A protein has these predicted regions:
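Acidic/histidine-rich catalytic cores and adjacent linkers
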Residues: 1-6, 10, 16-20, 39-221
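Short alpha-helix plus adjacent loop in nuclease-associated cores
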Residues: 18-39
């Protein structure tokens, strides 16, 4: 339908959703690896069971660190952390977690390379990394990589242009908050007037047209 209405439009995939897709794939892999440490074998000793529980809790507690750019993970916050006996930094926690599984480790560093290529707006480099790893990376990334390949031209546009859905989505969220904090509006014109006021769109003390839209008795209804 979009192509019919806007036949000459340049389609751009929002960059946020590209990174979100990578993060979701990595996080799903993290969950699969984590669950492995929540399984107890009949041959496990008490010490082994305790070790598994500790690693499981580490994955569950520090999962957000795995989704950050590596250079954004602190190397200076040396101190006591939950589920670690020794003092440790956030960067060391990441290394500890990815060292629990080679597939996770490979996927983590592949994702980091994709982040770098994406941030540098390096379209060719981005897809070279995908092509080089699509047959060897964890299964959680298969659908994501195939989707990227099927939408190459749109992703290229995302890296070429600075346009984004962010401002529009921000406006939509603000309107939703206005409606929520007002406990709903029975009168559409009252809601419209409140939106105009909040966004400073045409409202002034002398604007009779906007004033006529406002049902003051029902403004917060």
């Amino acid at each position: 339908m979009i192509k019919d209405i806007f036949p000459n439009a340049t389609v751009i995939i929002d960059r946020f959703h590209i990174i979100q897709a990578l993060n979701n794939s990595l996080n799903n892999l993290r969950i699969r690896v984590m669950k492995r440490f929540n399984t107890i074998s009949k041959d496990d000793t008490k010490d082994k069971i305790k070790e598994k529980e500790q690693i499981y809790n580490q994955f569950k507690t520090y999962w957000k660190l795995l989704l950050k750019r590596e250079d954004e993970v602190s190397i200076d916050d040396y101190g006591k952390k939950d589920y670690f006996k020794q003092w440790i930094t956030s960067r060391e926690i990441v290394k500890h977690l990815i060292n629990q599984d080679e597939v996770l480790k490979d996927a983590y560093y592949t994702t980091q390379m994709l982040y770098d290529a994406f941030d540098a707006r390096n379209y060719k480099g981005f897809f070279n990394i995908i092509d080089s790893n699509i047959n060897t990376i964890a299964e959680e990334f298969s659908a994501t990589f195939k989707t990227f390949i099927n939408n190459k031209s749109y992703i290229e546009n995302s890296l070429r242009y600075n346009l984004s859905n962010g401002p529009i989505e921000g406006i939509i969220n603000k309107v939703k908050n206005i409606k929520r904090t007002g406990y709903g509006y029975r009168n559409f014109f009252s809601l419209k007037a409140r939106v105009l006021i909040v966004f400073n769109l045409g409202y002034s003390n002398t604007d009779r047209n906007v004033k006529e839209l406002i049902d003051y008795d029902n403004l917060a209804a």
